[in-house]
From Swiss-Prot:
HAMAP family: L_hydroxyglutarate_dehydrogenase (MF_00990). It comes from the Bacteria. It is an enzyme of class 1 (oxidoreductase). It catalyses: (S)-2-hydroxyglutarate + a quinone = a quinol + 2-oxoglutarate. Pathway: Amino-acid degradation. Catalyzes the dehydrogenation of L-2-hydroxyglutarate (L2HG) to alpha-ketoglutarate and couples to the respiratory chain by feeding electrons from the reaction into the membrane quinone pool. Functions in a L-lysine degradation pathway that proceeds via cadaverine, glutarate and L-2-hydroxyglutarate. Also displays some oxidase activity in vitro on L-2-hydroxyglutarate with O2 as the electron acceptor, but this activity is most likely not physiological. Keywords: Cell inner membrane, Cell membrane, Electron transport, FAD, Flavoprotein, Membrane, Oxidoreductase, Transport. GO terms for cellular component: cytoplasm; plasma membrane. This is L-2-hydroxyglutarate dehydrogenase. One of its GO terms (molecular function) is flavin adenine dinucleotide binding. Gene3D superfamilies: D-Amino Acid Oxidase, subunit A, domain 2 (3.30.9.10), FAD/NAD(P)-binding domain (3.50.50.60). One of its GO terms (biological process) is L-lysine catabolic process.
């Protein structure tokens, strides 16, 4: 019997495993991942941005964890020889409406304690000769990294300290009882643990349901489609270039991202995916599609955002429509500059009353803790999220009348998190 089993080998699961084994070095800890390597889903299919914390409600978990995670991610990269680039983010307003929204973001960045600089149109053009706008905000602490590399380093650290990673282990059933949780996999394996930790991303709600618990949300998958610019445009921008987002929408808009390999990507958009892991337009699951349209909450979201949703679908099918979104601030790009690039799928939790759950969300049962909503900036925030989960695990074990074998916490989780932010 394991003391702890973590389900999910993305960056949240790996961060949690890495920190849990530091707190409980004598514990038997396993991580189950259905794929053959870490970071095969959301972690390995995102923009790679180290976010600063521009957009998030002051005092929210997103705001707090992003600010801490920005520094923690860079420190972890320094400790593990992972390349990153603190290139800064430029927010660009292209209309008077966006200027008004940008002023609100200016106040929010102040409330979140960020260093930033207000730029006039001329100052913006001086910094970014290929970008046009009425003004901008420059946030110097944003950066870029490969989160797949970060998650892999976390996995290596976990294994080096005695943790076990079991790949090709897709969970098919969970049974919670007084002394722990029994895990069954599609490969016919049965594993028992005193405490279960769910970091299942796109499958988070299904994992909770396996325990016989109504999660109070459903995961709605949104595919984010990208293009890569032709190599001659690798130096078209000096920073990460973001539009001013519509505050009514949960996503940040199509942006230009300087990738860590030197290329520049455009994206992502946000299109309803008809399969939980539907990375291609042709990926359709009848079961997943039926589940989406049976959900009153998701139907309400689609109704409330009908026009924008139809616009996203149109731009997904028509490259010229997609291009026009980025030409608002980078007019020199042409359709021929947009080259194919892999898409990602974002797991967005939706409440039964049709609200897009904005903050990070955690759900607990007597023997388990689950990360249930971890959209952007979850990758940036992975180390503080992992520390948060470990603190919840410690509290859960203390509340259990029979927590399994006695384990001594070798380190306080706050001290552990501080090790990544020195």
């Amino acid at each position: 019997m394991y003391d702890f089993v973590i389900i999910g080998g993305g960056i949240i699961g790996m961060s949690t495993a890495m920190q849990l084994i530091d707190v409980y070095p004598d514990a038997r800890i396993a991580l189950l991942e259905k794929e053959s390597a870490p970071a095969c889903h959301q972690t390995g299919h995102n923009s790679g941005v180290i976010h600063a914390g521009v957009y998030y409600t002051p005092g929210s978990l997103k705001a707090r964890f992003c600010l801490a995670g920005n520094l923690a991610t860079k420190t972890f990269c320094d400790q593990n020889n992972i390349r990153y680039d603190t290139c800064g983010k430029m927010l660009v307003a292209t209309s008077e409406l966006e200027m008004a929204r940008m002023r609100a973001l200016w106040e929010r960045t102040a409330a979140n304690g960020l260093e930033r600089e207000w730029l006039s149109a001329a100052e913006l053009r001086e910094r970014e000769p290929n970008i046009i706008g009425l003004g901008g905000i420059f946030v110097p602490s944003s950066g870029i990294v490969s989160y797949r590399d970060v998650a892999t380093a976390m996995a290596n650290r976990f294994q080096a300290k005695g943790g076990e990673i079991i790949y090709h282990a897709e969970v098919s059933a969970l049974t919670e009882h007084a002394a722990g949780v029994v895990i069954r996999t599609s490969q016919g394996r049965e594993i028992e643990t005193a405490t279960l930790i769910g970091c299942a991303g796109l499958m988070a709600d299904r994992l909770v349901k396996m325990l016989g618990v109504e999660p109070g949300f459903i995961i709605c998958p949104f595919r984010g489609e990208y293009f890569r610019l032709a190599p001659r445009h690798n130096r078209i921008v000096n920073h990460l270039i973001y539009p001013i987002p519509d505050p009514a929408m949960p996503f940040l808009g199509v942006h230009l991202t300087r990738m860590i390999d030197g290329s520049v990507t455009v994206g992502p958009n946000a299109v309803l995916a008809l399969k939980r892991e539907g990375y291609r337009k042709r990926d359709v699951s009848f079961t997943d599609t039926l589940e989406v349209f049976r959900s009153a909450g998701i139907r309400r979201v689609l109704k409330n955002h009908l026009l924008s949703g139809l616009g996203e679908m149109k731009n997904s099918l028509c490259k010229s429509g997609y291009l026009r979104r980025v030409q608002k601030y980078c007019p020199s790009l042409t359709v021929n500059d947009l080259q194919p690039w892999p898409a990602g799928v974002r797991a967005q939790a939706v409440s039964p009353d049709g609200k897009l759950i904005d903050d990070f969300l955690f759900v607990a049962t007597p023997r388990s803790i689950h990360t249930c909503n971890a959209p952007s900036p979850a990758a940036t925030s992975a180390i503080p999220i992992g520390a948060h989960i470990v603190s919840k695990v410690q509290a859960l074990r203390e509340s259990q009348s029979n927590p399994g074998r006695t384990l001594r916490a070798a380190r306080n989780v706050d001290t552990l998190h501080a090790a990544f932010t020195r």
